[in-house]
C-alpha cells in the first residue's frame, strides 16, 4: 500500500484550502483543523476537526490522535507553547515551533528584527494598559500606527493622527485582537511610497524569491495586490537582504511572506508570516508555481527549481458587507467574462462584516491592465 505522508493544518481558511489541494497533488493525506465547522480547507481535506486552537489540551489531543508527519500552522492564534513541547517530543512543526511562536504576535518578531538582527524598522513601543498606551503614543509622536499584538488580516489596526483619537484607536485594538484586552504595539508612521510582500522560500536547495508583490491596505487588510511591483535594483537588493536575514533566523523549510515598506531611499521591515500570504493569492495566475505549490514542495523537502513569472497579474478580494447565515455570491457570469480572469469562491459557511469571501484574479500583459481587469471583475461581484 502507498505510504503517504500526512499533513495536519492548524487553521483552515482559503489559503489553507489551496495548501491542501497542492499537498494532495503530491499524494499527501491532509487533515484540516479549525475553530468552526465547514472552514474552506475542510471542504477539500481528507479529514477535519473542530477545536479551540488556543486550548493546548485540544491541540495535543488531535495531534496525538492523527500523528501527522507535518504540522502546518495556517493562522497565528494557536497554542504555540504546546507546539514547542510537541516538537521536543518528535513532531515536525512547519517551519519550526519557535518560528510559529515568534510570529504568533508582533512583539517577538519585531524585537528579533530590530534588536537582534538590527534590520531597519519603524520606531515602536509596547503597551499593556490605556495609560501606558497614551505614554507610548506621546513617545512615538503623531501620526502613529496602533495594532493589537495578535490579530490577523489587519483586524484592530488603525492610524492615530492626534491625541483626541487615542481612545477610539485603543478600543479598536482591544476589539480586533485575537486575545481580547491584550497588549498593543504603537509604531512610528512611515510615510512610505508603497508596501510590498516579498515571498521568500527556504527549501532543500537554498533560498529563492518570488517577484515583489505590491499591495494596498485599507484598515490593515489588503484590498488589492499585484505582481510584479516595480522596484529599483537597490531596493530589490535591500529587500532580499532583509527577507533572507529574517527567514534564516527563523529557519526551517517553507514559504514566508515578508512584508516591507518602501520609501524613496530606504526599505523597512514590517512583518513576516511563516506561511503563504493573502496578498500572494495573485501568484495563482502569475507564476509557474503558486505560493501554495512552493510552500508544499518546500515543507516536503523537495527542491524548488527556478520560479518563473508567466505574466503580470492582480487580485481583488470580495468582502462581505454584513453578517448573513445564508448567502450567495452573485455576478460570477459577468466577472468570468472579463478577459484572463478567474474567481475563487472560498465557500465560508457564513459571512461577517469585512470577511473575505472570494477573490478575483486577473492576468494581462501589463500590471496596469491586470489591475483594471481585476477591478472590473470585482465590480460585478456581490454578496446577497
Curated annotation (Swiss-Prot):
For biological process, the GO terms are:
'de novo' IMP biosynthetic process
Q: Where does Mg(2+) bind?
A: 259, 271
Q: What class of enzyme is it?
A: ligase
- PROSITE patterns registered for this protein in UniProt: ATP_GRASP
Q: Which Enzyme Commission number(s) are listed?
A: 6.3.1.21
Q: Does the keyword Cell inner membrane apply?
A: no
Molecular functions per Gene Ontology: ATP binding; magnesium ion binding; phosphoribosylglycinamide formyltransferase 2 activity; phosphoribosylglycinamide formyltransferase activity
Where ATP is bound, by residue? 106, 147, 152-157, 187-190, 195
Q: Which reaction does it catalyse?
A: N(1)-(5-phospho-beta-D-ribosyl)glycinamide + formate + ATP = N(2)-formyl-N(1)-(5-phospho-beta-D-ribosyl)glycinamide + ADP + phosphate + H(+)
Give the ATP-grasp domain ranges: 111-300
InterPro entries in alphabetical order: ATP-grasp, ATP-grasp_carboxylate-amine, ATP_grasp_subdomain_1, PreATP-grasp_dom_sf, PurT, PurT/PurK_preATP-grasp, PurT_C, Rudment_hybrid_motif
Do the record's keywords include Transport?
no
* Residue sites binding N(1)-(5-phospho-beta-D-ribosyl)glycinamide per the record: 14-15, 74, 278, 348, 355-356
Q: Which of UniProt's keywords are assigned here?
A: ATP-binding, Ligase, Magnesium, Metal-binding, Nucleotide-binding, Purine biosynthesis
Q: What highest taxon heads this organism's lineage?
A: Bacteria
Name the pathway: Purine metabolism; IMP biosynthesis via de novo pathway; N(2)-formyl-N(1)-(5-phospho-D-ribosyl)glycinamide from N(1)-(5-phospho-D-ribosyl)glycinamide (formate route): step 1/1
Which family is it part of?
Answer: Belongs to the PurK/PurT family.
Q: How does it assemble?
A: Homodimer.
Protein function: Involved in the de novo purine biosynthesis. Catalyzes the transfer of formate to 5-phospho-ribosyl-glycinamide (GAR), producing 5-phospho-ribosyl-N-formylglycinamide (FGAR). Formate is provided by PurU via hydrolysis of 10-formyl-tetrahydrofolate.
Name the UniProt record assigns to this protein: Formate-dependent phosphoribosylglycinamide formyltransferase
Annotated gene: purT
Amino acid at each position: 500500500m502507498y505510504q503517504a505522508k500526512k499533513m495536519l493544518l492548524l487553521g483552515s481558511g482559503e489559503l489553507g484550502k489551496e495548501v491542501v489541494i497542492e499537498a494532495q497533488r503530491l499524494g499527501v493525506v491532509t487533515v484540516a483543523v479549525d475553530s468552526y465547522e465547514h472552514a474552506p480547507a475542510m471542504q477539500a481535506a481528507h479529514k477535519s476537526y473542530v477545536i479551540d486552537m488556543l486550548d493546548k489540551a485540544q491541540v495535543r489531543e488531535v495531534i496525538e490522535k492523527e500523528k501527522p508527519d507535518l504540522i502546518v500552522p495556517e493562522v497565528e492564534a494557536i497554542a504555540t507553547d504546546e507546539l514547542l513541547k510537541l516538537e521536543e517530543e518528535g513532531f515536525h512543526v512547519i517551519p519550526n515551533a519557535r518560528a510559529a511562536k515568534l510570529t504568533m504576535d508582533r512583539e517577538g518578531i519585531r524585537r528579533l528584527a530590530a534588536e537582534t538582527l538590527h534590520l531597519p524598522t519603524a520606531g515602536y513601543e509596547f503597551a499593556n494598559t490605556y495609560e501606558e498606551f497614551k505614554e507610548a503614543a506621546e513617545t512615538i509622536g503623531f501620526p502613529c500606527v496602533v495594532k493589537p499584538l495578535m490579530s490577523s488580516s489587519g483586524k484592530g489596526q488603525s492610524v492615530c493622527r492626534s491625541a483626541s483619537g487615542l481612545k477610539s484607536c485603543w478600543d479598536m485594538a482591544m476589539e480586533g485582537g485575537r486575545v481580547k484586552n491584550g497588549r498593543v504595539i504603537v509604531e512610528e508612521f512611515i510615510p512610505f511610497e508603497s508596501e510590498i510582500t516579498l515571498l521568500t522560500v527556504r527549501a532543500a536547495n537554498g533560498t529563492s524569491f518570488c517577484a515583489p508583490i505590491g499591495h494596498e491596505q485599507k484598515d490593515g487588510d489588503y484590498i488589492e495586490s499585484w505582481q510584479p511591483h516595480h522596484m529599483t535594483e537597490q531596493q530589490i537588493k535591500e529587500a532580499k537582504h532583509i527577507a533572507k536575514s529574517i527567514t534564516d533566523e527563523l529557519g526551517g523549510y517553507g514559504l514566508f511572506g515578508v512584508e516591507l515598506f518602501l520609501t524613496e531611499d530606504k526599505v523597512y521591515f514590517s512583518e513576516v508570516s511563516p506561511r503563504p500570504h493573502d496578498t500572494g493569492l495573485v501568484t495563482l495566475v502569475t507564476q509557474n508555481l503558486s505560493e501554495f505549490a512552493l510552500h508544499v514542495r518546500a515543507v516536503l523537502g523537495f527542491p524548488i527549481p527556478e520560479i518563473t513569472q508567466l505574466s503580470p497579474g492582480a487580485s481583488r478580494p470580495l468582502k462581505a458587507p454584513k453578517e448573513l447565515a445564508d448567502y450567495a455570491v452573485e455576478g460570477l457570469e459577468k466577472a468570468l467574462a472579463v478577459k484572463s480572469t478567474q474567481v475563487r469562491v472560498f465557500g465560508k459557511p457564513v459571512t461577517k462584516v469585512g470577511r473575505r469571501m472570494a477573490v478575483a484574479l486577473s492576468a494581462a500583459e501589463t500590471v496596469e491592465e491586470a489591475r483594471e481587469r481585476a477591478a472590473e471583475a470585482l465590480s460585478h461581484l456581490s454578496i446577497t
